[in-house]
Amino acid sequence: ANYYGFNVTGITISPAQVKRAKELTPYECKCNFKVMDALDLKFEEGTFDGVWSVEAGAHMNNKTKFADQMLRTLRPGGYLALADWNSRDLQKQPPSMLEKIILKQLLEQWVHPKFISINDFSSILINNKNSSGQVISSNWNSFTNPSWFDSIFEGMRRPNAILSLGPGAIIKSIREIPTILLMDWAFKKG
């Protein structure tokens, strides 16, 4: 925020995440954080010059409403940037039985309603009443995939970060390893 001179408003449904964000953000940064439902944003139309969403869409059970809320709060000519978990187009390339089993495990483990393809979400954005009609999308898997193994090794590099959180965090972290490995496999398969 300071580097670019932005005023930033971050939202999450988690009061704990808001508390943590406030603790980690230097006072001089022009950032504020709010507990808010992304499917029911309490901002006026055209409030923001830019909207940035990172890995939130996979958690949304209504992708159209999610897109509508982001685009509604974006000023005309503003920028929307999204980074999210998507699937390949499952109509064009249906999943194998093994892929269906793994996809079910990923959705259940991380409590996601469903993944959709980049093209499907692009269509939702293009056809939205608040859209300028211009959407540029890309698959960045090859750039982001290496970070999956880093997330496992981070616990080994800094074990006190996990150990200090207590037994529940340790058990959860160990449970996450197979799911992270499955997600890595799934990213490579599309």
List the model feature ranges, each with a label.
Residues 39-51:
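A short acidic, Gly/Pro-enriched loop at the edge of an enzyme's catalytic core
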Residues 17, 56-57, 86:
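Active-site-proximal loop/turn and secondary-structure-junction residues that shape catalytic pockets
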Residues 1-40:
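Class I SAM-dependent methyltransferase SAM/SAH-binding core
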Residues 26, 61, 75:
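Short conserved AdoMet
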Residues 82-84:
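Acidic carboxylate diad motif detector
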Residues 49-62:
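A short SAM/SAH-binding and catalytic strip from SAM-dependent methyltransferases
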Residues 93-189:
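Substrate-binding/catalytic lobe of Class I Rossmann-like enzymes that use SAM or dcSAM, i.e.
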Residues 64-79:
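A short glycine-rich, Lys/Arg-flanked "PGG" loop and its adjoining helix->strand segment in the class I
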